[in-house]
């Protein structure tokens, strides 16, 4: 969430920025009214507490003098009832304010280009040259089915649309990709491999910003009465980032760099009719995630570093891609600055997103109460959190099938993956 002090001290300015940069309309009148109620109730609560404490002290003194204290006891009792009622009202107002604040997106960094949607994103550069084929290229679905490695019909039978069964050498290639990515990030980029639960509680989802706004995008468990509800993770960012929730970290230990390979589960609400063919938009897909927890003054520099580490995967796989700086209208809810990496897909004759790398500033840290402290300063401050795909495994598989296809329908295995494939140079 954004800093409540910004809302209290610069509400009109923040509201205007949200409207212009995020197309988000903040109800200024309602929030102002609730803030006035909060301040009034806060003052009344503190006044009642102070008065009750003073009266309680008087009771002790009167009792010591042997005086009748029944009237004083009655006053304190009634004051306690009024205090409880006022506190309850204050809690209600605070909860209402909190619900509003939790729905407010992060403010973009100043350097983020203003724009309404993805058409106004800014291309930073391109890497690699798309291959020219001397035959009609096939898409990954035709290639995978021809090699009997992608079985979408089985996915439908077992689960429904947007699921797949992988088999044989294609399944092995899919596994090889995740192993290659993890090895690269742990051995060369300094990340600690992390294994996390795939089911998380609601506090975890609030921490990284999936709840309350994006509940419909999640797959939720049907909790029995009295049991804690869970949801399947939409990305490893959720459990990995929440490892620092309610923690005070030593600044000397920062940055914390963690990577995890997990399946990701998304309902794809609002995506009806989009990318219905193939692996591009699935309910279940694998991803290798990069997460960094850093000191605030380093986060913009770290965003460049983290994005470069995701780029390295594409470069070693020799897959042409482009780097795009997202405009304000296309950024994620909690991000202050995001780069997308888009890989070239020959069958679509276009670049498609394969990684999104974001600096969340202190947006998630404030929700999680994740703080750090230096040895020279006893005061704590919020950390900054960053995350990025390093990479989406299924989409990387798509890119390899299409970019490394041969005229006879076989697939050349990229050289960096051959050690993970038992030396296999060609599929099919």
From Swiss-Prot:
ATP-binding recorded as keyword: yes
Record keywords: Aminoacyl-tRNA synthetase, ATP-binding, Cytoplasm, Ligase, Nucleotide-binding, Protein biosynthesis
EC class (word): ligase
Molecular function terms, GO-annotated: ATP binding; serine-tRNA ligase activity
Record localization: Cytoplasm
Protein name per its UniProtKB record: Serine--tRNA ligase
Predominant subcellular localization, coarse grouping: cytoplasm
The protein's Enzyme Commission number: 6.1.1.11
One GO location term (cellular component): cytoplasm
Gene this protein is translated from: serS
UniProt-annotated binding residues for ATP: 266-268, 353-356
A GO BP entry: selenocysteine biosynthetic process
Function comment: Catalyzes the attachment of serine to tRNA(Ser). Is also able to aminoacylate tRNA(Sec) with serine, to form the misacylated tRNA L-seryl-tRNA(Sec), which will be further converted into selenocysteinyl-tRNA(Sec).
UniProt domain comment: Consists of two distinct domains, a catalytic core and a N-terminal extension that is involved in tRNA binding.
Positions bound to L-serine: 235-237, 289, 389
Subunit structure: Homodimer. The tRNA molecule binds across the dimer.
Pfam short name (any one): tRNA-synt_2b
Homology family: Belongs to the class-II aminoacyl-tRNA synthetase family. Type-1 seryl-tRNA synthetase subfamily.
Reactions catalysed, as given in the entry: tRNA(Ser) + L-serine + ATP = L-seryl-tRNA(Ser) + AMP + diphosphate + H(+); tRNA(Sec) + L-serine + ATP = L-seryl-tRNA(Sec) + AMP + diphosphate + H(+)
Pathway: Aminoacyl-tRNA biosynthesis; selenocysteinyl-tRNA(Sec) biosynthesis; L-seryl-tRNA(Sec) from L-serine and tRNA(Sec): step 1/1
Keyword hit for Lipoprotein: no
InterPro entries given in the database record: aa-tRNA-synt_IIb, aa-tRNA-synth_II, aa-tRNA-synth_II/BPL/LPL, Ser-tRNA-ligase_type_1, Ser-tRNA-synth_1_N, SerRS_1_N_sf, SerRS_core, tRNA-bd_arm
């Amino acid at each position: 969430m954004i800093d409540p002090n910004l809302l209290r001290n610069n509400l009109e300015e923040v509201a205007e920025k949200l409207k212009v940069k995020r197309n988000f309309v903040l109800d200024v009148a309602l929030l102002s009214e609730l803030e006035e109620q909060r301040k009034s109730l806060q003052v009344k609560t503190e006044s009642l507490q102070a008065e009750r404490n003073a009266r309680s002290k008087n009771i002790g003194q009167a009792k010591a003098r042997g005086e009748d204290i029944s009237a004083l006891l009655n006053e304190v009792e009634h004051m306690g009832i009024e205090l409880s009622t006022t506190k309850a009202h204050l809690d209600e107002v605070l909860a209402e304010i909190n619900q509003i604040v939790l729905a407010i997106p992060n403010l973009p960094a100043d350097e983020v280009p203003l724009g309404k949607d993805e058409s106004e994103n800014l291309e930073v550069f391109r890497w690699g040259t798309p291959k020219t084929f001397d035959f009609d290229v096939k898409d990954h679905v035709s290639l995978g089915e021809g090699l009997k490695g992608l079985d979408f019909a089985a996915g439908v039978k077992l689960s429904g649309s947007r699921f797949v069964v992988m088999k044989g050498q294609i399944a092995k290639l899919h596994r090889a990709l995740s192993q290659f990515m993890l090895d690269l990030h742990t051995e060369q980029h300094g990340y600690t491999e992390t294994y996390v639960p795939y089911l998380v509680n609601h506090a975890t989802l609030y921490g990284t910003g999936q709840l309350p706004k994006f509940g419909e995008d999640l797959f939720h468990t049907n909790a029995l009465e009295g049991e804690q509800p869970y949801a399947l993770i939409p990305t490893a960012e959720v459990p990995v980032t929440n490892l620092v929730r309610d923690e005070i970290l030593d600044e000397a230990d920062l940055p914390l760099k963690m990577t995890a390979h997990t399946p990701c589960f998304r309902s794809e609400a609002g995506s009806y009719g989009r990318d219905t063919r193939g692996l591009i938009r699935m309910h279940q897909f694998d991803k290798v995630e990069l997460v960094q927890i850093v000191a605030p003054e380093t986060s913009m520099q770290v965003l460049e570093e983290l994005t470069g580490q995701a780029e390295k995967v594409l470069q070693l796989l020799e897959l042409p891609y482009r780097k795009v700086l997202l405009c304000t209208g296309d950024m994620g809810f909690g991000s202050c600055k995001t780069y997308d990496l888009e890989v070239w897909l020959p069958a679509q004759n276009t670049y498609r997103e394969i990684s999104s790398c974001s600096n969340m500033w202190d947006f998630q840290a404030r929700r999680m109460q994740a703080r750090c402290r230096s040895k020279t300063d006893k005061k704590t401050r919020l950390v900054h959190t960053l995350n990025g795909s390093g990479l989406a495994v299924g989409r990387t598989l798509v890119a390899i099938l299409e970019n490394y296809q041969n005229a006879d329908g076989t697939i050349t295995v990229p050289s960096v993956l051959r050690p993970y494939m038992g030396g296999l140079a060609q599929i099919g």
